[in-house]
Amino acid sequence: MEQAPEDQGPQREPHNEWTLELLEELKNEAVRHFPRIWLHGLGQHIYETYGDTWAGVEAIIRILQQLLFIHFRIGCRHSRIGVTRQRRARNGASRS
């Protein structure tokens, strides 16, 4: 008779803890790129729609991920991803 293999992998942190850490990281990143009043409004909408549930947590994670993805895709001025650094003369003169 076949037996299930023993779990020999490393211990994983609980899903709920990981989800809350992800939400915290997304919130910290979002406040660097979006007005707080927008984020507050989003939080209010999620709370009114889902209440204090895991479905609400999952919804706000999904929305924040989409917002940040689109924001970076369009071209965030704060992002250094894919931007080559160019030095400019302070007086506007170009170097040839």
Curated annotation (Swiss-Prot):
Compartment(s) where it occurs, according to its Swiss-Prot or TrEMBL record:
Virion; Host nucleus; Host extracellular space
Gene3D superfamilies in alphabetical order: 6.10.210.10, VpR/VpX protein, C-terminal domain
Does the keyword section mention Ion transport?
Answer: yes
Provide the positions where the record notes the PTM Phosphoserine: S79, S94, S96
One of the record's GO cellular component terms: host cell nucleus
Q: Which Pfam families match?
A: VPR
UniProt modification remark: Phosphorylated on several residues by host. These phosphorylations regulate VPR activity for the nuclear import of the HIV-1 pre-integration complex.
Keyword terms, alphabetized: Activator, AIDS, Apoptosis, Cell cycle, Host G2/M cell cycle arrest by virus, Host nucleus, Host-virus interaction, Ion channel, Ion transport, Modulation of host cell cycle by virus, Phosphoprotein, Transcription, Transcription regulation, Transport, Viral penetration into host nucleus, Virion, Virus entry into host cell
Q: Which terms does the record give in the GO molecular function aspect?
A: molecular adaptor activity
User: Where are the residues of the annotated region Homooligomerization?
Assistant: 1-42
Annotated GO biological process: biological process involved in interaction with host; DNA-templated transcription; monoatomic ion transmembrane transport; negative regulation of DNA repair; protein homooligomerization; regulation of DNA-templated transcription; symbiont entry into host cell; symbiont-mediated activation of host apoptosis
Q: Family assignment?
A: Belongs to the HIV-1 VPR protein family.
- Any further remark recorded for this protein: HIV-1 lineages are divided in three main groups, M (for Major), O (for Outlier), and N (for New, or Non-M, Non-O). The vast majority of strains found worldwide belong to the group M. Group O seems to be endemic to and largely confined to Cameroon and neighboring countries in West Central Africa, where these viruses represent a small minority of HIV-1 strains. The group N is represented by a limited number of isolates from Cameroonian persons. The group M is further subdivided in 9 clades or subtypes (A to D, F to H, J and K).
Q: What does this protein do?
A: During virus entry, plays a role in the transport of the viral pre-integration (PIC) complex to the host nucleus. This function is crucial for viral infection of non-dividing macrophages. May act directly at the nuclear pore complex, by binding nucleoporins phenylalanine-glycine (FG)-repeat regions.
Instruction: Describe the subunit structure.
Output: Homooligomer, may form homodimer. Interacts with p6-gag region of the Pr55 Gag precursor protein through a (Leu-X-X)4 motif near the C-terminus of the P6gag protein. Interacts with host UNG. May interact with host RAD23A/HHR23A. Interacts with host VPRBP/DCAF1, leading to hijack the CUL4A-RBX1-DDB1-DCAF1/VPRBP complex, mediating ubiquitination of host proteins such as TERT and ZGPAT and arrest of the cell cycle in G2 phase.
- Spell out the protein name for this chain: Protein Vpr
The species is Human immunodeficiency virus type 1 group M subtype B (isolate HXB2) (HIV-1)
Ranked from the top, the taxonomy reads:
Viruses, Riboviria, Pararnavirae, Artverviricota, Revtraviricetes
